[in-house]
Amino acid sequence: MDVSREEQFLLFVTKKEDREGMMMNLAFCIPFAGLLLCIAVLPLVKAEWWEAHQPHAIVFWSLLFVLPFAFVYGPGQAFEKVLECIVDDYLTFIILLFGLFCVSGNITLEGDLAGSPRINVGLLLIGTMLSSWIGTTGASMLMVRPIIKMNAWRKRRSHIMVFFIFLISNIGGCLTPIGDPPLLMGFMRGVPFFWSLHLFPVLLFNVVILLTIFYFLDRRAYRKDIAEGLKPDISKPGTEVHILGLHNLIFLAMIVAAVILSGTLPGMAAFQDAEGAVRGIHLFGEVTLTYPALIEVVIILVAAFLSFKTTSVEIRRKNHFTWGAIQEVAVLFVGIFITMQPALMILKANGASLGLNKPFEMFWATGCLSSFLDNTPTYLVFLTTAGALGFTEGMPTILGTVPVAMLEAISCGAVFMGANTYIGNAPNFMVKSISDENGIRMPSFFGYLLWSVTFLIPVFLLDMLVFFL
């Protein structure tokens, strides 16, 4: 049987990662755990110190992984691993966030904006539906400021942004490969583009339950705000709501197109060499900045530049636009991406030996790991594992035939459970940072985890009982 170029490249990379992961010691995961502990605890006990010394903490924990790794495997191998992480994962991650942050910051709403339970439910529903078509990050950046602005008159607002993260930043992105990077990787491995629409019943089930819970929570908070004499500041009743900076939707479309291209170009023969590897600029060892990734970065940066050049500063002023949120995310996540490498390598090397062969097992394994690790490689590990189980009926992919129920479970686990923590998906921490900047007192890392355990985990248990058993 002939093996395609993409299959050859995937097999080569998988074997290389397996070799590394099998030699990896769990002790190398300590810096990742330490960094997560800092993110969770220090804002509570040493907030001012943490605010001033975040970069130093990132450097400390990153070096605590890199230096021992270099001692054991050699400086060249350590440098290659860090460079590979930065080029393959972090670069496109932060450029995408940056581009969407810039473009969305140049769009604002004006008029009679008063957040109420019904209006908030409607806005969360709109954002959730947008997530699958412009990405969870795109929808989050587009909707976060309008929702904050509409509820600015209220005292009790943190629950609104928590459910925003649940629905818009995560669960809503399950219907297309544009929605969330794991599904884009599935598309690159042979899953049809519109296959994810099969997940609509699961999405509808989750959205109905969570929006119902949210409505009653928000109604209670709303009544308390009104009872305390708070009311929306509407100076001109009847003023029509309108959008300023609407032309920036063109630049948003450019960014979405860049993401789609990054997922489709690597599979084209023009972007592959004779061995099936994606062409690009060789940097060091086996690290290459691929041409599809470079094209994505250039398009996004051009979109961000044009957005700023064509939009009035007054719109950004009305949005209270600052660079603080993107700076915080950029600093924290470079450390997270570097220190999580040992955990990902171990997972990739041992995923097939976990003994998972049922949809509900795949759902929880993929989801729990996606809550703390990058959900894209986690998705690929379990998709590869499922494809190697030898099933003959189901969805044919280049990794093997995967039963439809198992593919649905892996997809939902990766997309939905990124909502469990602030670091589970790209937009989560960004939404938190923007909310904090706008005076909303967001839960701490553990506080947010309590919200997800209280409201999300019961819903995911219902998902398992209804869809994956």
Model-predicted regions and their roles:
Residues 156, 175-176, 194-240, 416-469:
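Juxtamembrane and boundary regions of transmembrane helices in multi-pass small-molecule transporters
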Residues 68-70, 131, 141-156, 160-162, ...:
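Membrane-interfacial helix-loop connectors
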Residues 15-28, 49-58, 79-91, 193-202, ...:
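Interfacial loop-to-helix junctions that mark the boundaries of transmembrane helices
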Residues 254-389:
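Transmembrane helical segments that form the transport core of multi-pass membrane transport proteins
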Residues 196-310, 466:
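Core mid-bundle transmembrane helix pairs that form the ion/substrate translocation pathway
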Residues 84-96, 195-213, 282-301, 364-370, ...:
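Alpha-helical transmembrane segments
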Residues 6, 14, 44-48, 66-89, ...:
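Transmembrane alpha-helix boundary signature
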Residues 28-39, 53-70, 90-99, 244-254, ...:
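Hydrophobic mid-bilayer segments of alpha-helices in multi-pass membrane transport proteins
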